[in-house]
């Protein structure tokens, strides 16, 4: 059995971890970072960028760069939260045929948020595979505790599109509790996990206990807001900067996607800087232009101003904490430890609000960016049998039930019920001789059915004619360990039964998922071909450089016909490199290589010829020297007198 990896699929950043030698280990991605931006971009060349590379080009390609899609996953286009998001993102959000919120590129290509999330999951999968040196097919993926059934299903679908068998979906705060509590001793204790991430907020009250030598993590209650997070804090800063610039220059930057993307980056940086300093400056030269010329944005932002801008958002996160405590039957003083998770919890104002509410300082020894992935990896280890003596008891975050006569929501499973769980209730017909009943499955807390989330509708037919109130129809709900619901309705008299796994009404059909899986596989093949083409181009480029160097060094030693062949092969290869035909580049590289070898051979021969001439000259000089006869000279005296 291969490794089951743990993935924190975040709104802003994602992270992957594995169990390694009995301990959870966060894996660095190909850029050497422990977290990866949850950003996917489509370039004009058809390349798909994921992570840091997508983030780097966002300013110049705003309409094709998708971020924070986790806030759209499993949602209807008409949802108030989705409508609110439309004005804050530069890319297109539109309604799919089934009413889902989908995204759209500048050339009108439509994609489900699940497809975008699948790209991020693929990157996490590849990161793990590169580290392990083996194929990875199984994963535990985390979701916000307050995700409903539709959002959980959609996350599973994203995993499937990415080529992953999602063994378990677990709640982010629960995963963080696992990461924190696995190696901690000190008896039973109750902890609060406050998780304020990039796009969602959750709070869970969890009891960690030793039961018969087994460490048990039991979620007592959970609450949250799936549309509250760091993105909202960023948007407050963006709104402030836009308003200030409008006052100063009379130009509304909301209408400029390029300027908005630059503002988003600047707002996020400013927010982060103000966690450690009291003041920062947002400086964006050439942010826009009008008839009078270019305009520059330069605005000072203090920590006090930032805190004033987001004060209501911080307060909004405290109410779910109060509800979760009440649901758990506890007071703030009963909580032993408070754990902070999610990047937004680095903000001093947030930390202070949490400390004030719970009456104790939150712990700082848990990495808010990595704890969730670590917990997911631990759960993966539990499922694989690598981690022993750990029991995780999670809960369903929202009540589940059906619509009954008069539009009433009748709960069958109450919120904060430990999962997996089953529950049944018997209902009857509303009219005489009714031969079928429609079961409308809902999720939520409102008394009126229409205000809750509709999950599915199905019919149980073949009921024998009888006066109203006589037939008995048993409706059973079964929630699995992933928090995903299965519903059945049975006529007790005839034993006719209708079962349905809730495929969220806002989810993808099997056909759509299969198409997306095929598309993802095709893209993986395309990406592989692209990498091979780049490698071939790089090798060809190196060959061209080496050949030009050889011409410079040896060109004067060889004949013009040899140089002519090399120059022609060079030109052919350079032409081929302007295209995308890998085979042609390889063929012309081979031709140039052969021409280059001819050049080296000719140069070597020329050098040998030169050496031979030199050797011949030396030989003749030697022979002349050999003809000289050694003799002794004596002075001859001439006695003749002139």
From Swiss-Prot:
Gene3D superfamilies: 1.20.1270.10, 3.30.420.40, Actin, Chain A, domain 4 (3.90.640.10), Substrate Binding Domain Of DNAk, Chain A, domain 1 (2.60.34.10). The keyword Chaperone applies. Acts as a chaperone. NCBIfam families: PRK00290.1, PRK05183.1, prok_dnaK. Residues 603-627 are annotated as: Disordered. GO terms for molecular function: ATP binding; ATP hydrolysis activity; ATP-dependent protein folding chaperone; heat shock protein binding; protein folding chaperone; unfolded protein binding. This is Chaperone protein DnaK. The gene is dnaK. The keyword RNA-binding does not apply. It comes from Xanthomonas campestris pv. campestris (strain ATCC 33913 / DSM 3586 / NCPPB 528 / LMG 568 / P 25). Keywords: ATP-binding, Chaperone, Nucleotide-binding, Phosphoprotein, Stress response. Residues 603-623 have a biased composition (Low complexity). PROSITE patterns: HSP70_1, HSP70_2, HSP70_3. One of its GO terms (cellular component) is cytosol. Induction: By stress conditions e.g. heat shock. The modification Phosphothreonine is found at residue 200. GO terms for biological process: chaperone cofactor-dependent protein refolding; protein refolding.
């Amino acid at each position: 059995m291969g490794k089951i990896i743990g993935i924190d699929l975040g709104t802003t950043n994602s992270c992957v971890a594995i169990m390694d030698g009995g301990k959870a280990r966060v894996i660095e991605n190909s850029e050497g970072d422990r977290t990866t931006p949850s950003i996917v971009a489509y370039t004009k060349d058809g390349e798909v960028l994921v992570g840091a590379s997508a983030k780097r080009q966002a300013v110049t390609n705003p309409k094709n760069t998708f971020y924070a899609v986790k806030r759209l996953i499993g949602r209807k286009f008409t949802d108030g939260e989705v409508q609110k998001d439309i004005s804050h993102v530069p890319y297109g959000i539109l309604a799919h045929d089934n009413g889902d919120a989908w995204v759209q590129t500048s050339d009108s290509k439509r994609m489900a948020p699940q497809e975008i999330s699948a790209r991020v999951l693929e990157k996490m999968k590849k990161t793990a595979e590169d580290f392990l040196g083996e194929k990875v097919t199984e994963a535990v993926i985390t979701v916000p505790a307050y995700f409903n059934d539709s959002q959980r299903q959609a996350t599973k679908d994203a995993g499937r599109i990415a080529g992953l068998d999602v063994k378990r979906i677990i709640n982010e705060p629960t995963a963080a509790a696992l990461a924190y509590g696995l190696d901690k001793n000190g008896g039973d204790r109750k902890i609060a996990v406050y998780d304020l991430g990039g796009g969602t907020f959750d709070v869970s009250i969890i009891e960690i206990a030793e039961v018969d030598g087994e460490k048990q993590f039991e979620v007592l209650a959970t609450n949250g807001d799936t549309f509250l997070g760091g993105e909202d804090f960023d948007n407050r800063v963006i709104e402030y900067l836009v308003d200030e610039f409008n006052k100063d220059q009379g130009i509304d930057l909301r209408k400029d996607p390029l300027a908005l993307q630059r503002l988003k980056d600047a707002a996020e940086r400013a927010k982060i800087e103000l966690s450690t300093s009291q003041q920062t400056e947002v400086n964006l030269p050439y942010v826009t232009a009008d008839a009078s010329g270019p305009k520059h944005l330069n605005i000072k932002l203090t920590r006090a101003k930032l805190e004033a801008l987001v004060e209501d958002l911080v307060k909004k996160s405290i109410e779910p904490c109060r509800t979760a405590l009440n649901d758990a039957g506890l007071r703030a003083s009963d909580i032993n430890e408070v754990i902070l998770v999610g990047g937004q919890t680095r903000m001093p104002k947030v930390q202070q609000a949490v400390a004030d509410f719970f009456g104790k300082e939150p712990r700082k020894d848990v990495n808010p960016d990595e704890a969730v992935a670590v917990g997911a990896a631990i759960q993966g280890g539990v499922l694989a049998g690598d981690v022993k003596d750990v029991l995780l008891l999670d809960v369903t975050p929202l009540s589940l039930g059906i619509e009954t006569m008069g539009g009433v929501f009748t709960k069958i499973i109450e919120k904060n019920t430990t999962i997996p769980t089953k529950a049944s209730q018997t209902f009857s017909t509303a009219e005489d001789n009714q031969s079928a009943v429609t079961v409308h499955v809902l999720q939520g807390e409102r008394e009126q059915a229409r205000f809750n989330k509709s999950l599915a509708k199905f019919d149980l037919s073949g009921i024998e004619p009888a006066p109203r109130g006589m037939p008995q129809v048993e409706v059973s709900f079964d929630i699995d360990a992933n928090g995903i619901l299965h519903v059945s309705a049975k006529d007790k008299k005839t034993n006719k039964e209708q079962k349905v796994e809730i495929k969220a009404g806002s989810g993808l059909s099997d056909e759509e998922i299969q198409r997306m899986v095929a598309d993802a596989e095709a893209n993986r093949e395309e990406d592989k071909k692209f990498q091979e083409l780049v490698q071939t181009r790089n090798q060809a480029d190196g060959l061209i450089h080496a050949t030009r160097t050889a011409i410079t060094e040896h060109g004067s030693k060889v004949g013009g016909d040899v140089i002519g062949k090399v120059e022609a092969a060079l030109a052919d290869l350079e032409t081929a490199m302007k295209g995308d035909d890998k085979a042609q580049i390889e063929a012309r590289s081979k031709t140039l290589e052969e021409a280059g070898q001819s050049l080296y051979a000719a140069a070597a021969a020329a050098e040998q010829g030169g050496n031979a001439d030199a050797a011949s000259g030396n030989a003749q000089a030697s022979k002349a020297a050999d003809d000289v006869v050694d003799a002794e000279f004596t002075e001859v005296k001439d006695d003749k007198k002139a």
